[in-house]
Amino acid sequence: MDIKTLHPAIAAAYRVLETGEPISLEEAELLASLPGEFSLDLASLANKVRNRWGKGGIHACSIMNAKSGVCGENCRFCAQSRHNHADIEVYPLVDEDAVLFEARSCAEHGVSHFGLVTSGYGYRTMNAEFKRILAMIDRLHEELPELNVCASIGILGPETAAALARHGIAHYNINLQVAPEKYAGLIADTHGIEERMETVRLLRREGVNVCCGGIIGVGESMEDRVAMLFALRDLDVSVIPINVLVPIEGTPLQAAESVPLADIVKVFALARLVHPHSIIKFAAGRETLMKDFQGLLMLSGADGYLTGGYLTTRGRDLADDQRFSERLASFS
């Protein structure tokens, strides 16, 4: 490609392809401001960067909602918050056999990472429920040794972060959701963003790989999205899941406006240029909102996705996603 035909800001960003070094905040802000007509040029660059500097292949993971609803936090997008009024199934922490059944199904469909997710604030200290989760992790390691076991169980303290590391957790997910300075206004004010960031730091000190990303479509600006990407870089996270809001009836964001497709493409491309070596996953919104365009996101810098369903909304069939991955391989 003759980069002289590109917008100058995109042409300058081709430096990432040659060096593997990320773009600066100023460059990201300029690229974020470009009109939608340049989104595909940006996506093309991001895909090339992914192929040259990414981890290689397509990284699929699946999660299980192991404890649902009655969460005391007031996250505005979440169906599980007791502050909201969504119609969802509510249940306490499931038993080990139920977890093993779901995990085995994922492994049989070629999914390499399986995550246990629980509703609620988290586990700053050891308690009986947290010890049950540790036992589940041990059981999965014993029964399915080839499966990478992950967890997303909220805010942690030093004791619980160290325990998860000892029990061999592969990745821990806790999302920033938005730029740190916008968290209280756009997401929740029953807890602070610093608690989430400190959880990431605790886990990194214990040597645990962290999966940490955000959600778009909750009222943030494009500048806010860029700020979130750079906050993630400062936290040294290895996997970045990006969710697109799926409005759920009974939540404050049930009538939120959809994010333009060109902006979604731009966010994924910028994520790759800010994080050339990380795994960038497309999570919520892939099937329901992107529909025919979900493959485009996987060619805009993403190299992974969440498969098989989400916490309170349905996803796509595991077998369909397995075929999807095989077809995407021809672009690598």
Curated annotation (Swiss-Prot):
It catalyses: (4R,5S)-dethiobiotin + (sulfur carrier)-SH + 2 reduced [2Fe-2S]-[ferredoxin] + 2 S-adenosyl-L-methionine = (sulfur carrier)-H + biotin + 2 5'-deoxyadenosine + 2 L-methionine + 2 oxidized [2Fe-2S]-[ferredoxin]. It is an enzyme of class 2 (transferase). Residues 53-283 form the Radical SAM core domain. One of its GO terms (biological process) is biotin biosynthetic process. InterPro entries: Aldolase_TIM, BATS_dom, Biotin_synth/BioAB, Biotin_synthase, Elp3/MiaA/NifB-like_rSAM, rSAM. [4Fe-4S] cluster binds at C71, C75, C78. Binds 1 [4Fe-4S] cluster. The cluster is coordinated with 3 cysteines and an exchangeable S-adenosyl-L-methionine. Binds 1 [2Fe-2S] cluster. The cluster is coordinated with 3 cysteines and 1 arginine. The keyword Transcription does not apply. The keyword Transferase applies. Pathway: Cofactor biosynthesis; biotin biosynthesis; biotin from 7,8-diaminononanoate: step 2/2. Keywords: 2Fe-2S, 4Fe-4S, Biotin biosynthesis, Iron, Iron-sulfur, Metal-binding, S-adenosyl-L-methionine, Transferase. GO terms for molecular function: 2 iron, 2 sulfur cluster binding; 4 iron, 4 sulfur cluster binding; biotin synthase activity; iron ion binding. Its cofactor is [4Fe-4S] cluster; [2Fe-2S] cluster. Its EC number is 2.8.1.6. [2Fe-2S] cluster binds at C150, C211, K281. Pfam families: BATS, Radical_SAM. Homodimer. Catalyzes the conversion of dethiobiotin (DTB) to biotin by the insertion of a sulfur atom into dethiobiotin via a radical-based mechanism. Belongs to the radical SAM superfamily. Biotin synthase family. This is Biotin synthase.
